[in-house]
């Protein structure tokens, strides 16, 4: 995207040289593959000595995400989730292990956040997305009706593989967790193919670092900074970072729309922050990013500590920042990045720690 | 990516009753060895003018090609003089960025001095058509930036073509681009059949001409009958055949937005993002704004400062229900005296008659949101065309004024099979779909909803074409906006 890259390029630079250390794995070359899936572009970069092996591993990982799109999509009418949304009101439905697991994890985040994270918010999301496209804002009566369809407690999990909805109009939308879940499954594929150095990017909103690039302690990711003043960064090594931010306001002042819905209010979230969160898995970082944006920094600190091995940074358009951590470091200006360039031993340490 | 498995060898394109809409493709050749024109399936070569160009020109003519020479403004007169005895078909002028403004005048003079030659202007701003990811490859590594989930970015040449159609009227835009390889694997492999095919499809869909750059190794491999090279090229030939020149001049671009501007400077990115969001628009030069040029237009996006006569034209346009969006245009205008005013952080919205004027006081710093706003400003019931579940596809709507049929050109920058939904303004009884891979024509089933026709495109890989026809004797509102505007814009905008 030329214009946005022009904005960030001056601020951000990541130089990963594969020549600064002498370990055998540094002979690895960089390979890249991407694919349009889930309405965005998934990208994988891999360091590996064999182009054929790297290409095969990346292709299998991307195909796994394609498969999961067929499970979790609510745009595809023939996806497993769409079928569940059409039928689970009537009787408990048997679902695949993937769908059961991602909904189970979603509900755990709903409980953890006291309902702020809620995958049943789909009907409201759809309606407000229509408002984003220029359709009228839903009147209070319609909004009230839609809110009655929402509620994670209306989803019943029946182990080991059945799900039932206790509302005739409930719809699940996995948009706030599905990409993170897909990233984790792709990571599993890469690991199974003996890939030790890789980065997976789900449309810019979730990254996972497998191992580290040759000669470095981790994968340096610059985090969203609406102020262009802070340049927060994180080094990923066997962990993930996700970013959430409300849809930008219309230049014409239509502030009433947005794709992140507050389930309590039934309306788009109003926030001045962009939020990035580091966690052990893509599923957790993806779900937490929406949750922490919804609850804000004050309540969010407790959640970050509760989850463990996580960190979050809220950055406002004015440059105000709030950081919470229960382990990982988020680097900001003045918080030096001495560990960016290291020898092969540090890279091995990253692997050994896990 | 290889598309060999997705293409159906041996399929012949059937003759179409409806007109072909096409772009002309020349191949840029730099190597002495070359296959015959008949084999390559391309009749015209573009040869960069250099010390060895005369020998190359002879070889090309011997192989049955019409030869065009690519020259700079400094070279053009001398080469044209030489050409009176050398017999090449024409000259392609490649002005540098600073020479663009004078190029049109230079071409005019050359056409008078050398009436036997064809002179073409080459647009130098072309870029490789592609769907891009987020990661940026630096010299020594990767740049990665987190963000909210991003839509796939599409690099298209549509804005370049639209500007050229406005600023160089009377000639078909001709552009070229250099292949961009972002990572080591791409650099090693070079472009594949799908990349060449996408370039051909894009130019054809835009009704523009293209000089296709072939890497030296492919040129040599084709010249020496390498089977792999010919397997690749035969896939491209299917696209060359699909987009061959026809009577595209008879087709009219369907637009609902006009962009009025003095130059690309200051407006390019906004226009580029409008193209990205499938907003069908045309560009008007300063002198082209008149009542006729605003006929059938819903939204005028003005980057030029209007003078007295143009202020009247804009006032009349909005009074009848149009929306005028003025960007970084300053002055005293009659609509500023209205009582119906709403102010936002970046804009002032005036309700005028049945329409509205929106003034942005500064330049557009967020063209993505601006383009989405333009899309939102379009009255829902008058949006000519919408796509669903296809963020990597551009659609270009044309209308055949002789038949009132609508023709939609589709380009999928993902280069992977895609199924998606289309909604077109108007009621169409018959929809036929053809592609370079499958030929002509698959009949699609329309569904008629509230004045729109909806249908599913079953499988778009790179390029495709839809023919939408009314039932016999029926001519209602079609994809063009030739209906009377409903005139509720002022009320809508001020109630936001």
Where are these regions (language model features)?
Chain A
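Mature catalytic core of soluble alpha/beta enzymes
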Residues: 2-354
